[in-house]
Amino acid sequence: MIPLRCSSAYSLLIEYCATIRDPCEETYTSRGDHNLSISISLFDQKLEQFHVSLSHATVLVNQSLLPNDACPIQPGILRAISVDAKNLPCVDFPHLCRARGGCLAHHIEYEFVPFAYTERGDTEYMIVVETLGDDADIQFRKFIVMYQRIIAATWKHLCPQTFDCL
């Protein structure tokens, strides 16, 4: 059983440390079946991490930016890799790959990595995010937009049918 609880509103709060010189806040809302609401607060990119609060669960995100000048700006690849105790299947978005000539410099990948959270007896999930490309900021924004679909697809495995994770 996955110790990840879904709220009735299926809300997801993301605080993303992006830039201290140009702080801003963006909100993406999906009014589909999953009713996801994502709020991103941009702060300091040097911290290279953002914090996700999903109902009672907490997800810590660590972002790694690896610039690569060999490839032009292109849409990247989004891949969700689940590596928890239930060995959830991968959620892939291969249609986002528009790389030409085998250039895969612009690649975004993240994975759920569970680790113990003893205070509440729950499990926290760490999402490791790796961004390749000199347009990392653009790619990461695309990642945030697609995050709604990724989480929705992941929740189909975490919370089947009713999304009720008790």
UniProtKB/Swiss-Prot annotation:
Induction or repression: Expression and the subsequent production of PR-toxin take place under static culture conditions (oxygen limited), whereas no expression of the PR-toxin genes occurs under the strongly aerated conditions required for optimal penicillin production. There is a negative control of the transcription of the PR-toxin genes by the penicillin biosynthesis gene product(s), or by a regulatory peptide encoded by a small ORF inside the penicillin gene cluster.
Superkingdom assignment: Eukaryota
Function as written in the Swiss-Prot or TrEMBL entry: Part of the gene cluster that mediates the biosynthesis of PR-toxin, a bicyclic sesquiterpene belonging to the eremophilane class and acting as a mycotoxin. The first step of the pathway is catalyzed by the aristolochene synthase which performs the cyclization of trans,trans-farnesyl diphosphate (FPP) to the bicyclic sesquiterpene aristolochene. Following the formation of aristolochene, the non-oxygenated aristolochene is converted to the trioxygenated intermediate eremofortin B, via 7-epi-neopetasone.
Name of the molecule in the record: PR-toxin biosynthesis cluster protein 10
Protein's gene: prx10
